[in-house]
Amino acid sequence: MEPSMIVVTTENVTGYRTVRMLGQCFGVVVRSRGIGGNFIASLRSIVGGEIHEYTQMLEEARRHALDRLVHNATSMGANAIVMMRFDSAEIGQTMSEIVAYGTAAVIEPAR
């Protein structure tokens, strides 16, 4: 199990001071929905509303990308990730790329 990692979308962590910035880190996931899933989703898109199959796939992909980000930051020696963000893009018509990225840092409680 990974040691505890503080992940924030801000530049600083309240109550902590930054000891060292280690640099950028990221976690990337590319997901594809199979032909059957695309067919069902396309039928649902005709009616309108949320397409639950894609929502679930993207939520899982974000969690997976965040897990990879934490793993990569840990391997760099970080105990925190600051300025964390998500980005996404379509690859072709059937794949989605999800990227979680931020700055790996070493922090300690403020004195």
UniProtKB/Swiss-Prot annotation:
InterPro entries: UPF0145_dom_sf (IPR035439), UPF0145_YbjQ-like (IPR002765)
Ranges that cross the membrane: none
Pfam families xrefs: YbjQ_1 (PF01906)
Signal peptide: none
Superkingdom per UniProt: Bacteria
Similarity-based family: Belongs to the UPF0145 family.
Record protein name field: UPF0145 protein BRADO6695
Organism: Bradyrhizobium sp. (strain ORS 278)
